[in-house]
Structure formats: structure tokens, C-alpha cells
């Protein structure tokens, strides 16, 4: 079971840079990053409207959603910032550089999240191997971004 989850995560990892490259190209075609982001998120919104139509009985009530802590509703905002940023940054530094920096940022933040058990995550303390991994990753980021 864990192998399937790992393969799924790997496949998503393959798609993240593809999303950025597609959105950057779309931005050039439609006049800019804001327009491209709007089109991109409209497509995603449409998919979830369709899914919601088939799974409407499991949707939370409006009162439940508005009673949630605001930070729990920030995922869409963060996703919007990511998409807009990829459209602007990828043409400047390339998909590889962008992805390397994204992964480096993700690794740093997730090590901190795990170390402190943020939002109920299982606590996984920072250790020497994790620090060495971060150093190696940042070395790779520097090498990938060198001309």
C-alpha cells in the first residue's frame, strides 16, 4: 500500500513542473500571469464543481465552512500565489531552477513542520541526517541554477 502512495506522490511530483511550464506558456499566449492564473484556476474550479455535483451529500455546510479558523481556508490563496509565481519565475530561471528552489523551500518548511508537529503532524525531530540532506539539497540547487 505504501508503494502505491509513494508512486502517486512521485507522479504528482512529475506534474508540478508541467503545471508551471503550461501556465507560463499560457501566460505568454493570453497576455500575462494574471490572465493565465485566472484561466488555470477556472479549469480547476470546474473540475471540482463537477466532482461536487456527484458527491454533494458530503459537502460541508456553509455555516461549517465560515466557522473554521481562517488559516484553514488559506490553501487556495497559497495555491494562487504558487501558480502566479510559477508563471512569472519559470520564464526567468527555467523550470529546473524553479522546481529545485521550490523543493528546497518545501524541504525546509516540512522539516520545521515535522520537528514541531505543526497542525497535529507526528513529531519527527531534526537530526544530523536531515541536516546533511538539506545541505546536499541546497548544493544541488546551487549546481542546477549555475549557468
Predicted feature residues:
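Membrane-interface interhelical linkers
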Residues: 1-11, 25-28, 33-34, 42-71, ...
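Hydrophobic/aromatic residues within transmembrane alpha-helices
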Residues: 36, 89, 116-118
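Alpha-helical transmembrane segments of compact multi-pass small-molecule transporters, enriched
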Residues: 43-47, 101-116, 135
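Hydrophobic transmembrane alpha-helices of multi-pass small-molecule transport proteins
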Residues: 127-145
Amino acid at each position: 500500500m505504501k508503494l502505491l502512495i509513494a508512486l502517486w506522490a512521485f507522479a504528482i511530483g512529475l506534474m508540478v513542473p508541467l503545471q508551471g511550464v503550461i501556465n507560463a506558456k499560457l501566460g505568454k499566449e493570453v497576455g500575462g500571469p494574471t490572465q493565465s492564473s485566472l484561466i488555470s484556476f477556472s479549469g480547476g474550479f470546474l473540475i471540482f464543481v463537477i466532482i461536487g455535483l456527484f458527491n454533494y451529500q458530503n459537502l460541508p455546510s456553509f455555516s461549517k465552512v465560515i466557522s473554521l479558523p481562517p488559516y484553514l481556508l488559506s490553501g487556495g490563496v497559497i495555491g494562487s500565489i504558487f501558480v502566479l509565481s510559477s508563471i512569472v519565475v519559470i520564464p526567468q530561471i527555467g523550470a529546473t531552477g524553479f522546481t529545485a528552489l521550490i523543493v528546497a523551500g518545501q524541504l525546509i518548511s516540512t522539516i520545521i513542520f515535522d520537528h514541531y508537529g505543526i497542525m497535529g503532524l507526528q513529531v519527527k525531530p531534526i537530526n544530523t541526517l536531515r541536516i546533511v540532506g538539506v545541505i546536499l539539497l541546497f548544493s544541488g540547487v546551487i549546481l542546477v541554477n549555475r549557468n
